[in-house]
Amino acid sequence: MEMIRIFLIYLILKIIIINGENNEYSKGYGVGIVFPGSKCLNYVGDSIGQPLCNNRLFNGGKKIYSTVTLVDNKNISSQELSKIEILKSFEALTFLQDQCDDLLFTQFGLCDLNFSPCVETIPKITPLQNVSLPQRLCKSVCERMVSNCPRLSLKIDCSISFLFPEIGTEYNLTLYGYTENKGLYKVPCIDPTDGYNNISNQMELIQACPYPLLLKNSSDPKYSPNKGYTYLPPTNCVLTCPMPNYTKTQWKRVYDMAKTLSSISFICACYNILTFGILNRKRKSKYNICITLMSTSIALVYLTDIIKFGYGIEEFLCPEPGRSAVQNDAACGITGAMFHFGITYCCCWAMTMSIVLFCSVKRIKLFYFRHFMIGNTIFTIITTVILLSAKKMVAGTGYIECWVRERWFVITLFWLPCGIGLSIGIFCIGGVIHEIYNISKKVNIRESEFILRQIKPFSLVFSVAGSFLYLFIFFFDVERKIDSYKAAVADYVLCLLSGGSEETCFTTGPNYASFFIFYFFIRVFGVLFFSIYGTSRVARDIWSEVVFDEVRSRLSQSESGISRNNSRTDISFGKNNNSKNSNNSKNSNNSKNSNNSDNDSKSIELEKK
């Protein structure tokens, strides 16, 4: 729209020059155009929350040349359009602070260029009203602006006398009844230098940030970088949160993957803890202890994801617009400590399992297993405490969890020791592979069977080591390219300044597929542990024993109940028999006594006879 407007102005100027050949324009004056309906109005004022030209206008904003323009079938004031243009100009100047001098003067000049002071013809040359005419910026002012900031020459051409006359502008008002000076009405150009010199020491450069960047005061402790704000030097503009490396759809895919896979892995890890740590009473081995502790540590990692998604992932990572979470945010500090403890403890036990496996295969007598437990726990606690004490737990930009982001801390307290541990694990795995190869020659069937039993723990350690190796490579690849990523932010800003939006402009970051796989590997360990150990024969036997013991216990209780019932029945039956026997005995005795009595009576009777 602005280009069309400039073209029309150029066309009108050509017509005026051709038609006005008989008029003699003064040297040093530009040719002006009179727009019917133009008015001298007060400055409409700055937008709320965004200072622009208040206190920077030549005449204090009392009279500004104003017209009405038709845009999308709506009449819009030229002042409103100028506010849009001046905001874009200020946004560009904000990012030129380290390349230009005296930008404050440039802002004064741009304000007068876009909000031209307005003069009215005196006396009235029309019956009803004065003719309103703009005062243009002097050429010397334009040249000073371009001299201080050569980049402005790409947008401003000081040789255009229509905009930047040396002395003033002449307007042909013959159509309006003006006859003096052959109908040419002279309006002097303006030079804000004197006004600028009087108040410049009381003014500051106005900074403006293109959307979606946000403007913050970096000198205010509330908005300092250690609070989670990422500033774009030399400005006070901060990047959005999360980092605009990817589209909103791509970020959503990462969030959905993490949410789904973390939930599944957490359940799988809890299953392993329940199986090998709680229900297992008869198979207390070093392997099972390693499985339990690895599952516990990795469950802690996935618990942080459950907390995040319950809290709201975007609210968790970005508590405020433009600010990423830091350790002072309670949720970030707690989950960061849990994440570091869990991931470090898992690495320690992966190394421990590989050592135990190697020693078992090589028949090497291992020192007390509890030494591993003490060492792994102390190391993990110490590194976690150091990071918390240094307040290094942050969400950062372009990540989906709170953890340590400072290069030397994360290398010293995580990647270096864990890299050494994984190297030991890989060495032990190599020894196991070599031993399996030797045993596979059928030297001893019994020993071969023993070695083959170690395939699952070997697979687990190999998978964990391989996954961590990818994470290791990805991390250092990102660190290697971090400077190029930072340099590419300039292209992102240029895209925004050129009229781009958050849907079309992006910063440069790690390849999206690699980024997605990085977080996939971190969240797949729980499923991996379950697929190797949770479905093993040992796990099935543990559950079978638990179920069998429960069934046997219930059967035993049932049999005991039946036995007690039978005992009661037998006692009752015995009592009845005794009663019957007693009665029979009594009846027999009575019968005998009766018979004896009869016999006795008979004998008596016989004796009597």
Swiss-Prot record:
Range of residues in the leader sequence: 1-20
Compositional bias (Polar residues): 559-570
Localisation per UniProt entry: Membrane
Protein name: Frizzled and smoothened-like protein E
PANTHER family according to UniProt: FRIZZLED AND SMOOTHENED-LIKE PROTEIN B-RELATED (PTHR31787:SF1), G-PROTEIN-COUPLED RECEPTOR GPCR FAMILY PROTEIN (PTHR31787)
Keywords for this protein: Disulfide bond, Glycoprotein, Membrane, Receptor, Signal, Transmembrane, Transmembrane helix
Comp. bias (Basic and acidic residues): 599-609
Transmembrane segments: 260-280, 289-309, 338-358, 366-386, 409-429, 458-478, 512-532
UniProt cross-references to InterPro entries, sorted A to Z: GPCR_Fz/Smo-like
Main localization of the protein described in the UniProt heading: membrane
Cytoplasmic side: 281-288, 359-365, 430-457, 533-609
Extracellular side: 21-259, 310-337, 387-408, 479-511
Region entry Disordered, spans: 559-609
Superkingdom classification of source: Eukaryota
Keyword hit for Transmembrane helix: yes
Membrane topology classification: Multi-pass membrane protein
Stretches assigned to the FZ domain: 35-192
